[in-house]
Structure formats: C-alpha cells, structure tokens
Amino acid sequence: LTAGLLLLGFQAAAQDIPQAFQGKWAGHYEGKVSPKHIRALCAMGYDENAAMDNVYVSEDSGFYIEIGKKSIELTGWEWGAKYTKLNYRIYSPDKIAGTARVREEEPEQGTQIYNDNFEFSLNRGVLTQRFRDFSTDGSGKKVWRTRTLMRCK
C-alpha cells in the first residue's frame, strides 16, 4: 500500500499543468477586474510606461500570472514569484491545488525560497487564485484572499 501511495504522489508531481490553465493571465493583486481593464493590462504587459487608451491603470495595480507546463510565474509591481516542483492535491481540467517550491523576489526582502500551497480554478474563461497573505489589520496573521484574472490574447 505504501509503495502504491508513493507512486501515486510521484505521478501527480510529474504531470504537466492542464493545457486550459497554460498561458498569460492579467488582473489586479486582489479582487476582480473588467474585460476593459484586462485588455489594458495585457497591452501594458510588464512595461509600466506603456501607453494606455481611456483606462486608468496605475503601474502598481497590474498583476500577471504566466502558467507553463511545469511552472507558474507571478509578477506584480516590484515583486515576483515562481512556483516549481508542483505536487498536486487536486488535479482536474478546471482546478489544480497542492504544494510547490516558491522562489520569491522582492526589493526590500531580497530572494526567499520556501514551500507553499497553491490553488487555481477556471470558470468560463476566468482564472481564480486563492492564496494566503498577511492581514491588513496589522496582526501579522495570514488570511485567505482571492484574485481573479483573465487570459491575455
């Protein structure tokens, strides 16, 4: 039984991220955005100086997730993280969740490497990420937050 469970864990870790998740996604650090804002964020890319037509989007409001076959890369204003060595707890065409090795880059903190949970789901072309982050109440506690993103075309 133990050998079977170990093999199952290895197979889950070796699987590619489902094709439906792969690609570049844009949104805000937290919360929802409109299709108009997504088009502007996708046009802006990682260049905060790019021209934006009729849409106010500041350089610190854009958030991008690029999902490949084996990794997930998150990029925000002066911050980035790459998730590798994914081990799935849930693996389906519309939801993936599990643990990963994270390499986080931040100017004030430098580079940090740690293991963390990840959770992504798809519903009608919208990518939702649930993630843990520090509370804004100053308590230092971590709370669950949600961000929604749409695919860049």
Language-model features: where?
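Sec-dependent signal peptide recognition
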Residues: 1-3
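N-terminal signal peptide c-region/cleavage motif recognized by signal peptidases
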Residues: 9-11
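Short, solvent-exposed loop/hinge segments that bridge or flank secondary-structure elements
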Residues: 16-71, 106-115
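Predominantly extracellular/secreted and cell-surface proteins with exposed
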Residues: 56-104
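Short, surface-exposed coil-to-beta transition loops
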Residues: 58-61, 80-86, 109-117, 141-146
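Edge beta-strand at a domain terminus
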Residues: 83, 87-90, 124-153
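Acidic, glycine-rich flexible loop segments
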Residues: 91-124
